[in-house]
Amino acid sequence: MSSKLFCLRSFPSVQRTAWQRLVLPSTRKFSLTPTTFDKTPSGRIPPDQKAANIISSVPSTSLLTKSGVLTVTAAALATAISKGIYVVNDESIVVASFLGLVGVFGTLGRKAYNEWSDKTIAKIGGIMQAARNDHTSAIRERIDQVASLQEVESVTQALFHTSKETARMEAEIFELEQRVALAKEAKSVLDSWVHHEANVRAEQQERLVEDVLARVNSKVSTQKFQQDALNESLGEIEKVLASA
């Protein structure tokens, strides 16, 4: 009873149509003259296109499998209705309407989802392409930087030879400085020895002079030396007077 009330409240057009079909007399007029019907009236989908849409909506991959699924489903439904296993009632109408609404929303949502997924995929693809381009440009810049250092080996070798020559010259300069310092030290030692020898000689000469003077004074102070010197002086005077 509740399902009937829900059906009457939710689908008044369905209830009205069923009532008109059951109660009201048929007002359709029949004519014996042949009438030509338009198979594709305006505003309606052709049967072949509708069949193609139904077949394409079946979840399968091949056309044969889709046709088999539809055939088996229709046969099972007809068998269930004919055997009384399944009875069409208000609940069936509600379920069918719900499934129809779900199908409509699914179709509309599929389009929106496809658009959203396409935009998302395009956005992610753009981000990945931009990252790829940035990575490619970074690699190219690095390759250019490395290419500019192709002559680094020759420059390094030249710097190595220069540093080696500089080290050799510094060693020679240090050796010369040591030699100059040694020569200065030897000169200072020799100068000190010369000065010492000069002092020693001066002292020896002074001692010799003092010794000679002492000896002379000692000889001069003797009586004999004075007498000999006086006699020699007198002899020299006599020689001078004789020659004059």
Curated annotation (Swiss-Prot):
GO cellular component: matrix side of mitochondrial inner membrane; mitochondrion; proton-transporting ATP synthase complex
Signal peptide: none
Keyword match Ion transport: yes
Pfam families: Mt_ATP-synt_B (PF05405)
Alphabetical keyword list: CF(0), Hydrogen ion transport, Ion transport, Membrane, Mitochondrion, Mitochondrion inner membrane, Transit peptide, Transport
Predominant localisation class: mitochondrion
Transit peptide (first-last residue): 1-36
Cellular compartments annotated: Mitochondrion; Mitochondrion inner membrane
Gene Ontology terms: biological process: proton motive force-driven ATP synthesis; proton motive force-driven mitochondrial ATP synthesis
Recorded GO MF terms: proton transmembrane transporter activity
Annotated InterPro entries: ATP_synth_Bsub_B/MI25, ATP_synth_F0_suB
Similarity comment: Belongs to the eukaryotic ATPase B chain family.
Assembly description: F-type ATPases have 2 components, CF(1) - the catalytic core - and CF(0) - the membrane proton channel. In yeast, the dimeric form of ATP synthase consists of 17 polypeptides: alpha, beta, gamma, delta, epsilon, 4 (B), 5 (OSCP), 6 (A), 8, 9 (C), d, E (Tim11), f, g, h, i/j and k.
Reported function: Mitochondrial membrane ATP synthase (F(1)F(0) ATP synthase or Complex V) produces ATP from ADP in the presence of a proton gradient across the membrane which is generated by electron transport complexes of the respiratory chain. F-type ATPases consist of two structural domains, F(1) - containing the extramembraneous catalytic core, and F(0) - containing the membrane proton channel, linked together by a central stalk and a peripheral stalk. During catalysis, ATP synthesis in the catalytic domain of F(1) is coupled via a rotary mechanism of the central stalk subunits to proton translocation.
Name of the protein in its database record: ATP synthase subunit 4, mitochondrial
High-level lineage: Eukaryota, Fungi, Dikarya, Ascomycota, Taphrinomycotina
Gene name, Swiss-Prot/TrEMBL: atp4
